[in-house]
Structure formats: structure tokens, C-alpha cells
Amino acid sequence: MRRKALVVFTALIGMLALVGTGGAADKKLTFGIGISAPFAPFVIAVEKGFMEKRGVPAEYKMFESGAPAFEAVVAGSLDAGMVSEFIFVPARAKGAQISLVSLFTVTGKDLGAVVSKNIKSPKDLEGKTVGTAVRTSAEYFMYKYFEKHGVDVSKVVVKNINPTETAPALFRGDIDGFFLWGNWVPKAPEVVPGARVIAYSGDDNVYIQKQSLIFNTNSLKANRELVGKSLLALMDTIKFIKEQPDEAAAIAGKAFRLAPEEMKKQMAPLNYVVELKGSSINEYKASTRWIVGKGGVSIPDIDKFWSELVDASPLKAVAPGQTDL
């Protein structure tokens, strides 16, 4: 009897200790997301129950965009977020404790170039003024586009411009074109007579835009098994999106307060993936060299930088076929 009581007492002490230290048993993964189509799978994974089915207590918190959500990840108040290298590379170079665990959104149909009626070919941009958001994926696409089409960038006036000002500036003639992302691209020709989309970044394989799933490193270390299960849940979600696009769009649209038809339209050009491939890392290294060249961050050894940033172990543990690292 005394032995049985001792066993029960010991078990109770163990349970209290687990609760008191916030152990894995009561951990909930919190994803910071922007209110836009690239983040739709996180909403669907939670609301449709894919996270729960994989044994992952999870929630999402919405921000205006991925950038402020990422800042919360760096601060340690959220577990994970999703941004491009133009945000996470400078942060990591400045000491942010973050780990890249998977590529997530890939598209060649988000970044685009809009030009005025006077621009008939890429070379016509020489001697003209072009707007973009500097030090972002949009500016990187611009330089890759110029390189592809033999445009001498030294002959182009590049103006840093707020996205909300692009169409008005094009209308007034303050700029002759702009490179940007999202709805700013297709909407401009609707309000600026003669304007047109001259190219998207994926045309001629100029630049394929990527966003990756970034975890706070301390959270990853403390919840490695949960992180692996969450990757499986996201893979389940992506399969559902492909098989049931209407229902998927309705779920995401409700959270983002968008009509299902509009949500579906915005999700359509996006390729959601859970993978880590060496080819993608090599492309990331190329853009990292450009980021360093723009100034503001110093990365003496880019290969070492990326080997320390990427952690393929959670994906290897649950879906080894999704990574060749």
C-alpha cells in the first residue's frame, strides 16, 4: 500500500513539474502571418484541423504583413513566421536567432513590371525614371530584369517609392514604370491610360520569388518534434488546397475578410511547398550577395552563413524525401 502511494505521489510531482515549467505537453505553436494569400495555408491548417490531426496545438496571429510578424518571431513572442530573404537575411546578419526550416511559397506571378504607354521594350527604360521599393524583392527583380534584357542600369533613374504612390506617379508622368508586387501590378493599368504589365518575374525565368518558414531558434530547439509534425500538417494542408481550392479559399477568405472568389484568384498563382533543396539555397546565396552589395549588412562568409541559418533536421525526420540537404 505504501509503495502504491509512493508511486502515485511521484507521478503527481512529475506532472506538477511539467506544468510549472511550461513543458511540451502544454506548448502551442504560434504562427505570425500577414493578411494575404501567401499565408493562407496557416489559416487553413488551423481552422480545418490539420494541425490538430497531427498532434500539434497551434494558432495563428494576424499582422498587417509578414514583416511585423517576423519581428515578433525575432523577439521571441511568436514561434514562426514567413518572409523573404530580403527581410530575414539582414536580420540574421545582425544577430537574430532564427532558423530556416522550409521553403514555403514560390511564385513567378507576384512581382511585376508596369510601364507607361511610351515604353515599348525594356531598352526604352534607359534614360527614364523607374520606381520600386528599394532593398526588397521588387528591386532585386528589377536588376535581374535589366540584366536579362541588356538594360544599362546606370542609364536608369531608380526612385524609391511607396507602393500607394506608384499608380498616381505613373499617371502624372513622374515615373515611366515601376517594379512591385501584389495587386499594385495588375491594378495600375486599370487606372492609368495606356499603362501595361510588361513582365512578371517568372517570365523567361528571370526571378522566382521565394518565401520561407522561419522559426525562432530557441523555440525550434525546445519544440523540435512539434515543429516536425507541423511541417506534416502543412503538407496535408497544401494537398487539400490543391484538391479543394474552393473550400480552401472560403476558409482563408473568411479569416482575411475577402470574398472566396477573390481569395481563390489571389491564391491561384502561388505554389505552396514544404521542401528544402540545394538548388533553392544556391539561389538564396545569389540574392544574399546582392543584399550585401547594397550595403547595410556584412556577411564575410556567405556559405557559412547559410549553413548556420538552415536547419533541415525537422523536415528530414518526418519527410526525408522533401530535402536533399
What positions do the PLM features span?
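Bacterial N-terminal signal peptides that target proteins for export
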Residues: 1-9
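Solvent-exposed, polar/charged alpha-helical surfaces in well-ordered, non-transmembrane soluble domains
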Residues: 40, 44, 48-49, 71-75, ...
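Pocket-lining segment of extracytoplasmic ligand-binding domains
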Residues: 86-87, 159, 164-254
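Secondary-structure end/capping motifs
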Residues: 221-298
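Conserved C-terminal helix/tail region of periplasmic/extracytoplasmic solute-binding proteins
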Residues: 292-325
